[in-house]
Amino acid sequence: MVRFSNSLVGILNFFVFLLSVPILSTGIWLSLKATTQCERFLDKPMIALGVFLMIIAIAGVVGSCCRVTWLLWSYLFVMFFLILIVLCFTIFAFVVTSKGSGETIQGKAYKEYRLEAYSDWLQRRVNNAKHWNSIRSCLYESKFCYNLELVTANHTVSDFYKEDLTAFESGCCKPSNDCDFTYITSTTWNKTSGTHKNSDCQLWDNEKHKLCYNCKACKAGFLDNLKAAWKRVAIVNIIFLVLLVVVYAMGCCAFRNNKEDRYGRSNGFNNS
């Protein structure tokens, strides 16, 4: 049992070390070569994650295979808090993504999105001007509105209404159905006179760098994509959490074996 648990912890952490190398390399590459806001947003988290995994993996390998008890204890201490963090984040992700979905519009294939339908916590994130300015820049650089305009260049209004738009395209590239604007192209609409209950109608602009990027519908479209992504992450986290618990249990066995081995040596016994 001594050799099995220690060796297993060492092998598992060796694979974690191998995993950390491409993550760290990608983060460094992005920090040096990134040209867009979206790419630059990912470099520091990836570097931090890569370094963290590398340090944890080295501690696990050395602590278990070289029988360094204090290092293995530190490894288990960090692993315990990592399990708690992953568990809390998974629960949090399911809670904040439990609300909100697209609204079906009669006579149209696409859905529209209302910011009020999503959780208060998510709403506060996108209503923060600093956060949204960064997100908006990222959305604009992704050029999905430009691509939509190319795909629907020859569409009539009836053709456009048959398009199954993504949440981004529906929320950011066109005005709300409440505005009742006149269709010219997918990203160009003639405004109608009068007042509108939906504040997004006043925010709509035909200029390509504006469109509806500041609209509540665009924020809602972003949250709908974020919601779907977080749910996938939460499911992956459950699997990851199970693996963490298994590795932690093996680490506890290895820690106990290290102590027994040290006790045996101090008393003139050999436990190998």
From Swiss-Prot:
Extracellular topological segments: 29-45, 97-234
Domain of life of the source: Eukaryota
Glycosylation sites: N154, N190
GO biological process: auxin-activated signaling pathway
InterPro entries from the UniProt entry: TET_plant, Tetraspanin/Peripherin
Cytoplasmic side: 1-7, 67-75, 256-272
Short name of any one Pfam family annotated for the protein: Tetraspanin
Intracellular or extracellular location(s): Membrane
Record-annotated membrane-spanning stretches: 8-28, 46-66, 76-96, 235-255
A GO cellular-component term linked to this record: membrane
Membrane topology: Multi-pass membrane protein
Protein family according to the UniProt entry: Belongs to the tetraspanin (TM4SF) family.
Biological function: May be involved in the regulation of cell differentiation.
Protein name: Tetraspanin-9
Species of origin: Arabidopsis thaliana (Mouse-ear cress)
Chain's gene name: TET9
